[in-house]
Amino acid sequence: MRALIQRVLEAKVEVDGQTTGEIKKGLLVFLGIGRDDTLATGQKLIDKILKYRIFDDEQGKMGWNVSQANGGILLVSQFTLMAQTQKGLRPDFGPAMPPSDAKALYEQLVEYTRSQFENVQTGIFAADMKVHLINDGPVTFNLEVEA
């Protein structure tokens, strides 16, 4: 499972012109679910994201996690993160979990994230989403947990 996390000043997701999720300061999390991923894999990754210290503390160093920074989380499914890109000129999405299975796992991970953190917003699984953000820094990290 892979997550591309971005520290943002604000972010929102729109589907068909309607806002489905919106946060002010916090983390925009793009989540890619692999063929062999499980709920346990996802929980491990979510736990890491929640504890990952990429917000400035009182000394101006990356010492605070999203909770300590009083931020929110915008969680967006993105199967393209699982693409194999080493060969050729077209991404291979074979490593991504099939959509029907991925949707169920994504929904479980949203529920888990909400059980661990109060301010969680989401996109809509498999929808054509428009993501608006103001990246803070920019600060962007690619996190991965093996199944």
From Swiss-Prot:
- Where this protein primarily resides, as one coarse class? cytoplasm
Q: What is the role of the protein in this entry?
A: An aminoacyl-tRNA editing enzyme that deacylates mischarged D-aminoacyl-tRNAs. Also deacylates mischarged glycyl-tRNA(Ala), protecting cells against glycine mischarging by AlaRS. Acts via tRNA-based rather than protein-based catalysis; rejects L-amino acids rather than detecting D-amino acids in the active site. By recycling D-aminoacyl-tRNA to D-amino acids and free tRNA molecules, this enzyme counteracts the toxicity associated with the formation of D-aminoacyl-tRNA entities in vivo and helps enforce protein L-homochirality.
Q: Tell me the lineage of the source organism.
A: Bacteria, Pseudomonadati, Pseudomonadota, Gammaproteobacteria, Moraxellales
Gene name as annotated: dtd
Q: What organism is listed for this UniProt entry?
A: Acinetobacter baumannii (strain ATCC 17978 / DSM 105126 / CIP 53.77 / LMG 1025 / NCDC KC755 / 5377)
Name of protein: D-aminoacyl-tRNA deacylase
| EC number in record | 3.1.1.96
Cellular compartments per GO CC: cytoplasm
Keywords, in A-Z order: Cytoplasm, Hydrolase, RNA-binding, tRNA-binding
Q: What is known of its domains?
A: A Gly-cisPro motif from one monomer fits into the active site of the other monomer to allow specific chiral rejection of L-amino acids.
